[in-house]
């Protein structure tokens, strides 16, 4: 058992499970990469797997146990719980630190970014971090927080953060006091751009969140014991 390459005559060619773990396969469209190599390998693989499945061609043809299918275009699909690891942390300080790390993931610095772009990203990330901390500790879920942020201008958002009076959150936005309204609006726009998909796309909104009644949620820890398939439609690859 291992990575299956195919058959020639009576001989089967494969890389055993305990052999080299990295294999790349390059070929034109429709030449059998999925059907002759990937699907047979997944069918006989003893370990777990994480599969990005374009249009469901792989998932529909692999019958294995412990399979989780995450399909953002399917309203009945399992959810992805982005807050799972944060919810598990015991102290508010640890949760706040994790929320700041999440803001970094959502608003990373681009390579070769201009000084102006860096400014708006870094300062916009402060707004996002303050908002995540404020609304997370109010019990909101991720999509709900994104909707709350995007629906408000920077003045209204800052007023709400100030009124809720979470000390840690306030530390991220006090530096905006007395600064240019135009620059602050630009920072808020950068924040909105980073999370707009989660606040406005109906498919994404229905696929991200904590477990709900009748709907389980997938969490990263399950990669250690489950076979996870992420289904993405061809048309979404350029988004």
Feature map (PLM): residue ranges:
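P-loop NTPase motor domains
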Residues: 19-239
